[in-house]
C-alpha cells in the first residue's frame, strides 16, 4: 500500500513537515510494509517558505532590507534545489513589522524588491512569492523602485516610493532595471481577485486594516487611479482591471506591469505543482491531509480540500487529521475527504495541545490507530 501524506502546518504548533513525519511514524507502526511518502503543504501564505524548504531539501537565505516603515528588517527566504526562490512578502513588508498604528501614506514595499534582487544576484531565476499579510497600499511603487524603476514628477525629481508619490508620477524610466530580471519567472501566490481601483479595489476593501481612514478612501482611490493611468500609458497596456491587481495593496498590479514573466495564481495550486503531488498520487492508494482546525470553512478552503480533489482525481481514498474538528466539518465529506479525525485524545488545555511534542505524539498515535483500522478492514474484504 502506498500512502501520500500532505498536511498543512498547525499554526503555532507543528510545521507541515513535522506533522507529516509524525503521521508517517504512526502509519508505519501500524503497517510496517507501507510505502509512505511525505510532501510539504501550504497555501502560499504564512508557512509556505518553511514548508517548501523543509520538504524539498532547500536552504534559508537571510538579507537585511527596508521594512514597511523605512526601518531595517532581517528577512528570510528559501532557495530550493533547482534554484527556485520561495518568498513571503510579509517578511519584508508585512503588517506585523509595523510598530504602533499603520500609516498607509508612509508604508513601502521597497524591501520586497530588495529581497528579490538579493535572490537574483545569488543566481535564482524562478520565484514563488506569497503576497499576503502586507502593510502597504502604494501600488507596489516601492518594490518597483528597488528593482530599478524610477518615477519622476513634473520637475524631473525622482519620487520617494510611498503612497503620497502616486498622484505626482508623470514619467517612468526603466534604464536601471537589471537585465537578469527578463530571465526570471515569477509565480505569485494570490487568492485575491480584486482589481486595483474602484470600490472593489485595494483601498476600499483592504485599506482599513492598513490604516486607511473611511474619509480618505475616495481620495486615495482616485490617487491610485491616476497612478495606474500613468503606468498604463507608459506600458501601452492595461493591468488595473486584471484579477489580483489589487492584492497586497496593489503589489499584484506592480508584478503585472514591472515583470515580463509573471503569473498570479491560487497559492495552493502553485504549491501543489511545486511539490509534484499529482506525480506521487498516480500510484497511491490513500492520501492523508489535514490542518490545525477542520470546520465548515475548511470545506470552502483551499488546502485540505485542494489535496482531496487531487487525490480523488487519481482514485485515492482521502483521510484528514486535524487538531480539532467541529460539527459542521461534515461538509468536508462532500468535498472529497472520505473520513476525518481529531488528534487530541483527551481533555487538555490549548497550550498543552499546541505544544509541539504533544502535537507530534497525538498525530503519531492517531495515525497509527486509523491505519490499524484500515489494516483490519482490508482483511475483511
Give the positions of each predicted feature.
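N-terminal loops that bind phosphate or other acidic moieties
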Residues: 1-131, 135-381
Amino acid at each position: 500500500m502506498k500512502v501520500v501524506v500532505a498536511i498543512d502546518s498547525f499554526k503555532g504548533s507543528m510545521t507541515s513537515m513535522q506533522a507529516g513525519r509524525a503521521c508517517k511514524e504512526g502509519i508505519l507502526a501500524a503497517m510496517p510494509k507501507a510505502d509512505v511518502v511525505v510532501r510539504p503543504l501550504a497555501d502560499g501564505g504564512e508557512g509556505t517558505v518553511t514548508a517548501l524548504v523543509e520538504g524539498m531539501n532547500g536552504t534559508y537565505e537571510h538579507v537585511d532590507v527596508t521594512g514597511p516603515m523605512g526601518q531595517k528588517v532581517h528577512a528570510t527566504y528559501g532557495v530550493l534545489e533547482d534554484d527556485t526562490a520561495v518568498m513571503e512578502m510579509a517578511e519584508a513588508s508585512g503588517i506585523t513589522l509595523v510598530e504602533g498604528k499603520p500609516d498607509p501614506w508612509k508604508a513601502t514595499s521597497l524591501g520586497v524588491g530588495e529581497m528579490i534582487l538579493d535572490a537574483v544576484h545569488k543566481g535564482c531565476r524562478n520565484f514563488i512569492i506569497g503576497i499576503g499579510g502586507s502593510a502597504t497600499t502604494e501600488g507596489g511603487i516601492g518594490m518597483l523602485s528597488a528593482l530599478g524603476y524610477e518615477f519622476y514628477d513634473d520637475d524631473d525629481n525622482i519620487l520617494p516610493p510611498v503612497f503620497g508619490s502616486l498622484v505626482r508620477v508623470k514619467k517612468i524610466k526603466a534604464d536601471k532595471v537589471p537585465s537578469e530580471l527578463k530571465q526570471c519567472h515569477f509565480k505569485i501566490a494570490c487568492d485575491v481577485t480584486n482589481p486595483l481601483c474602484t470600490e472593489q479595489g485595494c483601498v476600499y476593501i483592504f485599506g482599513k486594516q492598513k490604516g486607511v481612514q473611511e474619509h480618505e478612501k475616495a481620495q486615495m482611490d482616485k490617487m491610485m487611479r491616476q497612478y495606474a493611468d500613468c503606468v498604463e500609458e507608459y506600458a501601452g497596456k492595461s493591468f488595473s482591471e486584471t484579477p489580483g491587481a489589487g492584492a497586497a495593496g496593489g503589489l499584484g498590479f506592480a508584478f503585472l506591469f514591472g515583470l515580463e514573466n509573471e503569473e498570479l495564481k491560487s497559492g495552493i495550486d502553485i504549491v501543489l505543482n511545486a511539490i509534484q503531488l499529482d506525480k506521487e498520487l498516480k500510484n497511491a492508494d490513500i492520501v492523508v491531509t489535514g490542518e490545525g482546525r477542520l470546520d465548515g470553512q475548511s470545506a470552502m478552503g483551499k488546502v485540505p480540500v485542494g489535496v482531496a480533489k487531487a487525490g480523488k482525481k487519481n482514485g485515492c481514498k482521502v483521510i484528514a487529521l486535524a487538531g480539532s474538528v467541529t460539527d459542521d466539518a461534515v461538509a468536508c465529506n462532500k468535498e472529497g475527504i472520505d473520513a476525518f479525525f481529531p488528534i487530541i485524545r483527551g481533555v487538555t488545555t490549548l497550550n498543552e495541545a499546541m505544544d509541539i511534542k504533544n502535537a507530534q505524539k497525538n498525530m503519531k498515535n492517531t495515525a497509527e490507530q486509523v491505519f490499524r483500522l484500515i489494516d483490519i478492514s482490508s482483511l475483511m474484504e
